């Protein structure tokens, strides 16, 4: 039996989770022992699908995994509040056979992409953005060049 299955809403989340969890000795960053896992993606690749059907997608994994983690963004048209999303999914998971101690829900507010696009020198390094040469941060440069709308939490 494997330790954990992660159900994520889309390919971007899958890449993020795999990028972290597939690093050598990743568990040390979490302060836990090593564990094995699977990452699965909602077939529709969206947050509402995980919200509505995540418990169904995870039912077969009750026999093969000890724990389940559901991860989705809170940002979609008509989305309930994050605490309601968490409560609803947990209720569905427990009704479908998971115990409350063996599963959890992570609701990312506002959404994963907004967290990734935070104003950070690490992001600038990843994009090989030369702040010193341009005398401006990457976020400001994108805004000045019309690539990041003023009221947006991330570029389109």
Task: Describe these PLM feature segments.
Residues 6:
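Conserved SAM-binding loop
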Residues 44-50:
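Acidic-and-aromatic substrate-binding clefts and catalytic sites of carbohydrate-active enzymes
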């Amino acid at each position: 039996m494997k330790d954990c299955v992660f159900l994520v809403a889309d390919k971007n989340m899958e890449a993020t989770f795999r990028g972290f969890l597939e690093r050598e000795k990743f568990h040390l960053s979490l302060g836990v022992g090593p564990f094995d896992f699977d990452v699965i993606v909602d077939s529709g690749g969206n947050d509402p699908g995980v919200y509505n059907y995540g418990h169904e997608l995870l039912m077969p994994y009750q026999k093969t995994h000890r724990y389940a983690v559901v991860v989705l963004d809170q940002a979609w048209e008509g989305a309930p509040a994050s605490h309601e999303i968490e409560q609803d999914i947990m209720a569905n998971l427990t009704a479908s056979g998971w115990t409350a101690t063996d599963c959890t829900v992570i609701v990312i507010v506002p959404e994963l992409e907004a967290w990734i696009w935070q104003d950070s020198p690490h992001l600038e390094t990843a994009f090989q953005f030369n702040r010193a040469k341009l005398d401006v941060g990457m976020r400001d440069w994108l805004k000045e060049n019309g690539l990041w709308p003023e009221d947006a939490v991330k570029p389109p």
